[in-house]
């Protein structure tokens, strides 16, 4: 007997929420894959057109700054811009990333470094995505720790860039070791971020599923797609560091 006459969600509501969560989670993954295919497509086009590669090489730092600007703008307008604008920014970022990633990948042997790094990325990403999707825990409590680790990685990276630029011999001698350590830390950080982001998408959709507001759900879907895309790309770059450092 329930003295307060309070009832939980009905079985049909639970089933409806689970269906919507599954649909929207798949939607985020689908948009992420479309973004990756856009990146690959631009990369292949760049390899087929030397003028594209030359442009990317000559303007590499500018393209990187534009990419950062797009991501910051996306984050700032994530809950105010219309969904089509967010999708446009997502595709723009994916396309620009095709140019920069192609240049980075060309530094490495395809069969000894790039392909093993890609296979490793798929394994880590899929494994931790499954963890994020199936766990009953809210993984957001892990965010401060991985953010702190990410901040540490960024600071160390800038210090090493400064060491090369100003020719600090003391630090420059450790560049390969630091790069390898950053690679391993990056794999851990972005694997955990993958689980956190999948878990966040699932929880966010669960909270608003019964509102039947397609705009909110579409927004959660594309925001989640960018997060997953960034996790995948950064995992790949981290594994490139590791495999590339060992060759």
For each of these PLM feature ranges, what is it?
Residues 1-247:
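A hydrophobic alpha-helical transmembrane-helix feature that marks the membrane cores
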């Amino acid at each position: 007997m329930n003295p307060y006459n309070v009832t939980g969600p009905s079985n049909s509501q639970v089933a409806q929420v689970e269906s919507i969560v599954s649909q929207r989670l798949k939607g985020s993954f689908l948009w992420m894959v479309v973004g990756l295919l856009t990146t690959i497509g631009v990369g292949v086009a760049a390899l087929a057109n030397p003028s594209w590669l030359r442009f990317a090489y000559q303007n590499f730092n500018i393209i990187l700054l534009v990419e950062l600007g797009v991501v910051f703008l996306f984050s700032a307008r994530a809950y105010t811009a219309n969904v089509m604008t967010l999708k446009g920014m997502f595709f723009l970022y994916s396309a620009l990333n095709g140019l920069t990633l192609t240049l980075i990948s060309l530094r490495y042997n395809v069969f000894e470094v790039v392909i093993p790094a890609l296979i490793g990325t798929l394994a880590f990403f899929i494994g931790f995505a499954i963890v994020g999707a199936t766990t009953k825990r809210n993984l957001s409590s892990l965010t401060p720790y991985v953010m702190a680790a990410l901040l540490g990685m960024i600071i160390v990276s800038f210090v090493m860039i400064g060491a090369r630029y100003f020719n600090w011999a003391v630090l420059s001698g450790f560049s390969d070791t630091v790069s390898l350590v950053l690679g391993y830390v990056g794999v851990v950080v972005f694997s955990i971020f993958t689980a956190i982001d999948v878990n966040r998408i699932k929880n966010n959709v669960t909270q608003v599923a019964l509102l039947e507001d397609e705009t909110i759900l579409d927004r959660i879907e594309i925001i989640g797609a960018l997060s997953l895309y960034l996790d995948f790309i950064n995992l790949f770059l981290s594994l490139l560091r590791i495999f590339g450092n060992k060759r």
